[in-house]
């Protein structure tokens, strides 16, 4: 018999294997200062493109004031216990009513954390006789939720409607034999590449196949729709989304999440979401803070307008310079380049140390070998000067990449890793 930890000591995993080279700089970096476009990294001022504070609410004075007042009045603990037992308040109910109205649903239910909330939603919605069909590029919280499913699941190629219908047909045939139903899961906005899920095309197939649709709209809520009501409203299909989910961690710059749908489904989830039934209620400081943030989304359209002004300036500028930003049609701005992992590391180091620009880097195995993805997250708080400075820097680093400067800088690391 082996020691349980033997495999842990031998292999840190696909990402952990690079920790000796990456930790503290490329992964687990420490950003300091007030949240926003201008922060500090390792003691230096940086222009930050790596936080999802889309509407600039994280450091908005009205938000900070309400957060401070709520903390002073309630502390960090109130209410204590799970919602079902002793952690329920009228403020939780008020937020749920307002969220439901905002996203055009009958009812909503608060979740204390987005990731575990989504895992629990999937677990609660399906039985072993049901079949799940989901996009292959779904977020990890969806994948982990699907892993709990004892029944069959099918993945379809990303945003590929031919692949989707093929797998939907397989699911329908299987569900006929098991006596179960079908749950389709998509993201409203895919956070890595910035593409909207093809919700309009998906719901059109409801006429042919009897399925229910769950949408994770973490990046669409607050950014899409006339007031930020989300991707479903933006595409005109919100009524066809059976279960709508979003987090407070992005546009609302807070903690928590919610799920919305018809009243009967939400009531069922209220009594069957294990991650909520057996966990502490969302603290009042976050509930009061979310109410304020929602009010600002409802009454300050200029925040969303400023966001999109910045998105358009950035994305148009990148395209004019010949950069490949994929098929993004949202705020998420990916820049695809050809290069190895060592070249990517040298490039990001150059951006941070010599251009003062901080952003997220994505490499293999998340994307294909030989590709580098630099993900830029524009917000309402960025300025035109921030964008123009970044565009100039990107032109400079691309030239260095293409002329082999970064390969030469990390020659030893390249030798160790190979052409990854």
From Swiss-Prot:
Pyridoxal 5'-phosphate binds at residues 114-115, 219, 247, 249. It catalyses: isopentadecanoyl-CoA + L-cysteate + H(+) = 3-oxocapnine + CO2 + CoA. Keywords: Acyltransferase, Lipid biosynthesis, Lipid metabolism, Pyridoxal phosphate, Transferase. It is an enzyme of class 2 (transferase). One of its GO terms (biological process) is biosynthetic process. The keyword Translocase does not apply. The modification N6-(pyridoxal phosphate)lysine is found at residue 250. It comes from the Bacteria. One of its GO terms (molecular function) is pyridoxal phosphate binding. InterPro entries: Aminotrans_II_pyridoxalP_BS (IPR001917), Aminotransferase_I/II_large (IPR004839), AON_synthase_class-II (IPR050087), PyrdxlP-dep_Trfase (IPR015424), PyrdxlP-dep_Trfase_major (IPR015421), PyrdxlP-dep_Trfase_small (IPR015422). Its cofactor is pyridoxal 5'-phosphate. The keyword Lipid biosynthesis applies. Its EC number is 2.3.1.-. Pathway: Lipid metabolism. Transferase involved in the biosynthesis of capnine, a sulfonolipid present in the outer membrane of gliding Bacteroidetes and essential for gliding motility. Catalyzes the formation of 3-dehydrocapnine from cysteate and isopentadecanoyl-CoA (13-methyl-myristoyl-CoA). In vitro, products are also detected when 13-methyl-myristic acid is substituted with tridecylic acid, myristic acid, pentadecanoic acid or palmitic acid. Belongs to the class-II pyridoxal-phosphate-dependent aminotransferase family. This is Cysteate-C-fatty acyltransferase. The gene is capB.
